[in-house]
Amino acid sequence: MKLPIFIADAFTTKAFRGNPAAVCLLENKLDEDLHQKIAKEMNLSETAFIRKLHPNDNFTQSSCFGLRWFTPQNEVPLCGHATLASAAVLFHKIKNVHSTLTFVTMSGELKARKEEDGIVLDLPLYPAHPQKLHEVEDLIKTAIGDTLVQDVRYSPDTKKLLVRLSDTYNRSFLESLTVNTENLLQVETTGKVKGLILTLKGEPGGQTQAFDFYSRYFAPWYGVAEDPVTGSAHTVLSSYWSEQLGKKDLHAFQCSNRGGELTISLRSDGRVDIKGGAALVLEGTLTA
């Protein structure tokens, strides 16, 4: 078996920042168990597998492909950064002739559009509903201790818990927070929560430029302690912060060690466009 494989850093234009994803191009059907084995071998938060949908398709001329995402532990229903990385490989390395690509996924059809300053992902927008604090208080205290919380929301579609920190905190505070993700696994065992979003209102002008909000994302339930930059989390964050700020166009920064920024536009059809850059950092062949 020889498979073309790439690593691209998503939601950045600089190598070694943003969120790295492995991208595998599948010329032929792959044994089901090999998807997970390859993802575990790559040991990144996600490995994406792009497959041809019809025998006569090819990666240069076709515009519609199948796409699946795997963490080192299991398959996930949606991954924004690995979708961006997949589109970047097809657009910039394979030189696909189309300006818009369609990916058939567990979350429906997702489109990626090439623009001069990045790639725009057309993603579903997920509402986050008010969450009773007492039901998740142990989880929140385990994650952030006595840190002041301003709002708690829950997205049943994505099983993500959104915790907004008090507006009295700033970006530096969010960046410095230590979250013991192993303890989260011991506290939340019901399956209700599969991802924890910590978020904070942006500061006017920010530290170097204006961001509407900041976030960090933790998903130990999927084998990912902290994800560097998370497109799927922003399908929830976009809905929340648009409502809070009364804006349809947002600029966001995810405050992981690697960091990454996202340009967001909520659409009238109930979906969201999320734009980011990508840097291709590795190209090779997987042999087994």
Curated annotation (Swiss-Prot):
GO MF annotation, one: isomerase activity
GO cellular component terms given for this protein: cytoplasm
EC id: 5.1.-.-
Disulfide bonds: none
GO biological process assignments: biosynthetic process; maintenance of gastrointestinal epithelium; negative regulation of transforming growth factor beta receptor signaling pathway
Cited Pfam families: PhzC-PhzF
Enzyme class label: isomerase
Keyword terms of this UniProt record: Isomerase
Superkingdom of this protein's organism: Eukaryota
Record-annotated active site: E46
Oligomer and partners: Interacts with UNRIP/MAWD.
Protein family (similarity comment): Belongs to the PhzF family.
Protein name per Swiss-Prot or TrEMBL: Phenazine biosynthesis-like domain-containing protein
Organism: Bos taurus
